[in-house]
Amino acid sequence: RQQARAAMWKIIGEIDEANQEALLEALPPEGWFYRSRFGEGVAQTAFLIVQHSDATLWRRFLPVLQPLVASGEVDGEAYGLMFDRLAVAEGRPQRFGTQVVCVDGKQVVDWPNIEDPDNVEERRRAMGFTTTLSEYQALFADYPPCS
């Protein structure tokens, strides 16, 4: 089972790398695939390619994406997810609480690792999140046990 999992992740990694190269080659001069110009599908696909890459691409694109949230060219929840993913990778607190941790076999919101937790719900609302952190936590209730 472990051998099959390793083989699967190797293939996924190769596909991710090819997708990242293709995205960078196709990147328009304005620096992102705007929804209004390229459509929701292209914008979402580009986001997912970057989201499933590494900190190097997250650092490159977060400053490009952030101002596009206000104009509606980029989804605020998606931006928050990438922002938090980079923060966790760099050992910094999350701003929106999107990255969960495994505690006692359950996926839970990492409350101790949230920047200014008293104002996290306000930040989430301002960014366009559709759930509170409690509602987000509830989404993980039926997940299989983690380790």
PLM feature spans:
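N-terminal helix-rich structural modules
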Residues: 1-93, 97
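Low-complexity, Gly/Ser/Thr/Pro-rich intrinsically disordered linker/tail segments
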Residues: 138-143, 147
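An amphipathic alpha-helical core segment
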Residues: 66-126, 130, 139
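Secretory-pathway/luminal and periplasmic proteins that interact with or process carbohydrate-rich
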Residues: 55-58, 132, 145-146
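Short, surface-exposed acidic
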Residues: 34-37, 131-137
